[in-house]
Amino acid sequence: MFVFPASVLAQDSPDWLTKFPRREVHVSAWPGGKKVAVSFALFVEVFGFGQGPILRPDLASRNPDLVNESFRQYAISAGNPRLGRLFRELDVPLSVVLNAAFADAHPAVWKQFRDTQPKAPIIAHGINNSNDILPLGRGLTEQRAYIRRTLDLIAKSTGVRPTGWSSPSVYHNADTMQAIASEGLSYSLDQMDSDTISRLQTPSGVLTLLPYPTVTVDMGQFLARMKSPSEIESLWLDYVVELAREARANPVREATTVVIGLHPFVFGTPDGAASMRRVLSELKKDDTVWLTDTEAILKAAGVN
């Protein structure tokens, strides 16, 4: 008899954050018999002048802070299109996690990027990533209004109304999950504690939770742990290849999923893109790995 790992069994119980019922979605294999679904999700974000990620904390007190602002502007204007081109060139699906204010704030950049990725699923990511984020602690009604405004803005500026959600800075609460479901969204990237898909039964409907592991998010590794793109390249390959090895060692093991957070600040530079190219080229060689997008995962799992 095969015994599921404790981490899998733990999903068939109340969610530890929201206390809502949560159950694993059982997937024996992905299309083509593959066992590890990998979706790279590019975070296309807007911060505003003087706000956002800081590469050089020692210079952040300058006014204006030209060095760190240049770091951010380069990522937005050069990094996003470069990554769009790279994924198109290698014919690897890409998912897009979008701040609602981005397309209007940077219309030329958005057009240039979207021309390279016209069919990439768009996942809503709040209004911006600095001063217009989720109103946590202010009740369900205000969160619903914020999420609705986010969806309306994205639909107006891109022509696409998202069905997925990612909370800015992965900062949310139980009201967020209920509000997401209330506004007609079907899935979230806010699950950071598993290798398998699960379903969250909120009072307003069911949400599918796609695994978005903390350790694989490039921004945290880059800014908090001071890892270079080539070091993150090694981490990503180790992470996915080990999941594939586990699957080959135990063929009856549940198929796994990992959505990997990708930011233009880290991998949108020429050296970062070179690392990204090596990651994708290596993963394409593994017949256990399915490189795909978030919506294809939902469809294959039968939950879209």
Give a label for each model feature.
Residues V8-A10:
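Boundary at the C-terminal end of the N-terminal hydrophobic targeting segment
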Residues D12-G32, D152-K156, V160-R253:
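Active-site-adjacent pocket scaffolds in enzyme catalytic domains
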Residues D12-P121, N129, T256, V279-L283, ...:
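Active-site beta->alpha N-cap acidic-glycine motif
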Residues H106-P107, A174-M177, P270-M276:
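Conserved strand-to-helix beginnings and helix N-cap segments that scaffold or border functional pockets
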Residues S77, L140-R148, M226-L237, P270-A273, ...:
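Non-membrane alpha-helical structural segments and their capping/turn regions in soluble enzymes
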Residues P21-V25, Q117, Y187, M192-D193, ...:
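C-terminal domain-boundary segment and adjacent tail
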Residues R62-P64, P81, E89-N173, I197, ...:
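Metal-dependent polysaccharide deacetylase catalytic core of the NodB/CE4 family, i.e.
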